Every structure is written in C-alpha cells, then in structure tokens.
Amino acid sequence: MQPSPDSPAPLNVTVPFDSELGLQFTELGPDGARAQLDVRPKLLQLTGVVHGGVYCAMIESIASMAAFAWLNSHGEGGSVVGVNNNTDFVRSISSGMVYGTAEPLHRGRRQQLWLVTITDDTDRVVARGQVRLQNLEARP
C-alpha cells in the first residue's frame, strides 16, 4: 500500500484537522491506508480514556484518504465526502500509540464503503468503524 510516485494523495499531504489531531499516515494507496496517532492527554475525556470522537475522526480521515486515492486512480479525478460514519468502541485505553488500517468493502461509481480497524500497541482492537463516502465529480 505504499504510494506510487504519481499517487493522487501523497503521504506528505497536509489536512489541518488531521494535523491538529496528530494523525500521521504511514501508508496510502487506492487499496487501503494506514495511519497512527500518539495518545496525548488532550485527547482524553474526563474519565481519563481516549474520547470516542478521536476514534470517529481517525476512522473517517483514514477511510476518506484511501477512498480519494482510489477514486483518482480509477476515474477522472474528483473528491469524496463522508455521508455516514458508524464507529464501535471496543476497548478503552489512556496512553500509547493507536494504529488505523482501512480496507475497501465496496468501491462503486457513486459511493464507496470502507472498514477501518484501530488497534493499540499490543495489537488489540480498540475501535472499528465503517464509513460510506459519496464520490464527487471533478469540478470543471
């Protein structure tokens, strides 16, 4: 899944929200993506565990980047927007690194569906989500 030299979504792309979150992509291509995030105190909720919104944001960002890469490698450009994000929280953690991996479930002309799994330092699943994305035509 390493990006090719002509990848439509290079690893060094800067997305302000992802940067604020601390999300770093390690692999990106039309068939999937991987990213990691260092759990810091500002990402914790009152009880001291990672806020569920962090996982929702990771899942949508990772799925969106992979979907964008696929759309632009199999079409005439364009973009994607999330239309549904269904995230399940499996296990709570309060520190360490988390790793997200996206895999396609459906990639069609109008929509895509991606599954993202987030694991901790010991490879335990901490969250899992599906994101449905709408493919948008390139603007003239």
UniProtKB/Swiss-Prot annotation:
The enzyme's E.C. designation: 3.1.2.-
Enzyme class label: hydrolase
Keywords: Hydrolase
MF terms (GO), sorted A to Z: 1,4-dihydroxy-2-naphthoyl-CoA thioesterase activity
Entry keyword annotation includes Hydrolase: yes
InterPro entries, per the entry: HotDog_dom_sf (IPR029069), PAAI_dom (IPR003736), Thioestr_dom (IPR006683)
Key word Repeat present: no
Cellular component aspect of the GO annotation: cytosol
Pfam families xrefs: 4HBT
Family classification: Belongs to the thioesterase PaaI family.
Additional notes on this entry: Was identified as a high-confidence drug target.
PANTHER family according to UniProt: 1,4-DIHYDROXY-2-NAPHTHOYL-COA THIOESTERASE 1
Name of the featured protein: Putative esterase Rv1847
Origin species: Mycobacterium tuberculosis (strain ATCC 25618 / H37Rv)
Lineage, highest ranks first: Bacteria, Bacillati, Actinomycetota, Actinomycetes, Mycobacteriales
